[in-house]
Amino acid sequence: MKLNRISYVLAGALLLGAPAVAQETVPAAPAAPAAPAAPVAPEAPAVPVAPEAPAVPSAPAKAAPVAAKGAAVKDVNDIAGATAVLAKCDQNHNYFQDQQIKTDMVLNGGVHKNVKYSFDTYTRGSKRSVRFDDPPEMRGMGVVTKGRDEVYARLPDSNKVRRVGTHAKRQSFYGSDWSMDDMSMIYFEQDYAVAKVISLDDNGHYTFELKLKNGVDLPYPKLIVKITRDTLLMDYIEYYDDTLSLKKTQERFDLKDIGSGHQVYTHVRVTDAATKHTTDNYVKSEKINQNFPEDTFTKRWLVRSL
């Protein structure tokens, strides 16, 4: 197959007594001599006691979600609170020093019917690298994002590593609903400001409208995001283009621990608003804090697979 377009798969990715104090023993005072015992009256017959009612078990206490501490929105005018929630959400999704995930990507719609790709994604901070291992014609293809303006790709049809231009970053990759720009959207609060609090409790979610910050080069001037109130994790995104028309949606499902000790969304679906074409990412495994070499985010890393 020939590759004409470049994009990225966003996997994913996210969002758990004090010792007893010894008492000092004080010696007891000597007891006073006992007074002579008074005659004891005969005991009255014992009154039968009704049997004790069985104890009603108490409901287990529900622990407050750790993730929600320190960030909340008081009312629809609380933009500062919403901004704090968005920043905490970013933190909850990026809880690692570095991360490696294995993902299967499935395309459906138009000419695609259950077309499947498999790849590994490596992330550290704002850097991200991807390497495909299946199907065979995609094996060795890779993408390295060192920053929003420095992206390199290795294309199987050319066997060369090339720097990706701005126009190419906005295009689809091999028919998927992801783009290279999507790959760089890791910390939302860095790129977007909260423009409006749409809802404080939409089925257990905060709903915010986000506006692209000045000077940020992304093709989505507006986003609508939903963040769970209990765990402060983002599980729904709407992307709007320059005409403020809905471009696509992203939904995240199946939050669970798959090996790192943290919960991540293991199924992510992106849907094109116009064509209804879908791309489903299934995260198969996750490893964190492996301290893999910084070389993972360089052109040399891509060249090694040639």
PLM features: residue spans?
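N-terminal, post-signal-peptide region of Sec/Tat-exported proteins
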Residues: 97-127
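Functional cores of ribonucleases/endoribonucleases
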Residues: 129-145
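N-terminal propeptides/low-complexity segments immediately following signal peptides
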Residues: 23-61
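Flexible, processing/modification-adjacent segments and terminal tails
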Residues: 62, 68-88, 94-97, 104, ...
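Bacterial N-terminal signal peptides that target proteins for export
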Residues: 1-9
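Gly/Pro-enriched, hydrophobic low-complexity segments
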Residues: 160, 184, 203-299
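Bacterial N-terminal signal peptides
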Residues: 8-17
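Sec/Tat signal peptide C-region and signal peptidase I cleavage site
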Residues: 18-22
